[in-house]
Amino acid sequence: MATLFIADLHLQTEEPAITAGFLRFLQGEARQADALYILGDLFEAWIGDDDPNPLHQQIASAIKAVVDAGVPCYFIHGNRDFLVGQRFARQSGMLLLAEEERLDLYGREVLIMHGDTLCTDDQNYLAFRAKVHTPWIQRLFLALPLFIRRRIAARMRADSKAANSSKSMDIMDVNPQAVVDVMERHHVQWLIHGHTHRPAVHELQANGQPAWRVVLGAWHSEGSMVKVTPDDVELIHFPF
């Protein structure tokens, strides 16, 4: 019995090794799980479910095969792929979840999320996030021709990279009080998230008791997952 969590694969055609590693993961470890949760940034960018990128169809088919094998797959949007919609969800067999979800895993209450909303010290990012999550702005963007959406997405990624290069490492990490606040709001002692690309298990205090925050790593030269069993919560890195 095990439930698996992954995040921050940032799949793109320019990184075929990561795609190959993910496909092997779906054909192997994922098939043995009780469920698979993808906590955002599965893709480096997402400009709409109507994008005919062959990579998207390949990934949808691979995830659907896992679902068809009896392993439910769930998805929480990240800051790169927040426009993933119901069309792709149907193609892949995944169920789209809310930004914050509380799970009962073998008697252990666990909160899961992408993690970007915990970075409350980065006010510029939060302002940008609020803007691009505005429903009418999303509808307007998705109504644009694909070639224009690609240009906008490329410019946004370039601007984000430039902005992050001038930010301190601390400002791009989670705010400790934001972590405690969200755990106490959901009455949990465990939090699993991604986004920061700083894999670790942090011990803290929440709800007047010991608590743990497990941070998933990004997939670069190796894979990263959290494996929850009735007896343990493990942060695991593995070769592609």
Swiss-Prot record:
Primary location class: membrane
Organism whose genome encodes this protein: Klebsiella pneumoniae (strain 342)
Classification via InterPro entries: Calcineurin-like_PHP_ApaH, LpxH-like, Metallo-depent_PP-like, UDP-diacylglucosamine_Hdrlase
Reaction catalyzed: UDP-2-N,3-O-bis[(3R)-3-hydroxytetradecanoyl]-alpha-D-glucosamine + H2O = 2-N,3-O-bis[(3R)-3-hydroxytetradecanoyl]-alpha-D-glucosaminyl 1-phosphate + UMP + 2 H(+)
Gene3D superfamilies (alphabetical): 3.60.21.10
Binding residues for substrate: N79, R80, D122, S160, N164, K167, H195
Pfam families: Metallophos
Keywords: Cell inner membrane, Cell membrane, Hydrolase, Lipid A biosynthesis, Lipid biosynthesis, Lipid metabolism, Manganese, Membrane, Metal-binding
GO cellular component, one term: extrinsic component of plasma membrane
Cofactor(s) the protein requires to work: Mn(2+)
Name assigned to this protein: UDP-2,3-diacylglucosamine hydrolase
Function text: Hydrolyzes the pyrophosphate bond of UDP-2,3-diacylglucosamine to yield 2,3-diacylglucosamine 1-phosphate (lipid X) and UMP by catalyzing the attack of water at the alpha-P atom. Involved in the biosynthesis of lipid A, a phosphorylated glycolipid that anchors the lipopolysaccharide to the outer membrane of the cell.
Localization (cell): Cell inner membrane
Enzyme type, top EC level: hydrolase
EC number: 3.6.1.54
PANTHER family: UDP-2,3-DIACYLGLUCOSAMINE HYDROLASE (PTHR34990:SF1), UDP-2,3-DIACYLGLUCOSAMINE HYDROLASE-RELATED (PTHR34990)
Binding site residues for Mn(2+) 2: D41, N79, H114, H195
Its membrane topology: Peripheral membrane protein
Keyword Translocase: no
Keyword Lipid metabolism: yes
Intrachain disulfide bonds: none
Record pathway: Glycolipid biosynthesis; lipid IV(A) biosynthesis; lipid IV(A) from (3R)-3-hydroxytetradecanoyl-[acyl-carrier-protein] and UDP-N-acetyl-alpha-D-glucosamine: step 4/6
GO molecular function, one term: UDP-2,3-diacylglucosamine hydrolase activity
Positions with a binding annotation for Mn(2+) 1: D8, H10, D41, H197
BP GO annotations: lipid A biosynthetic process
Family under the similarity heading: Belongs to the LpxH family.
Cofactor comment text: Binds 2 Mn(2+) ions per subunit in a binuclear metal center.
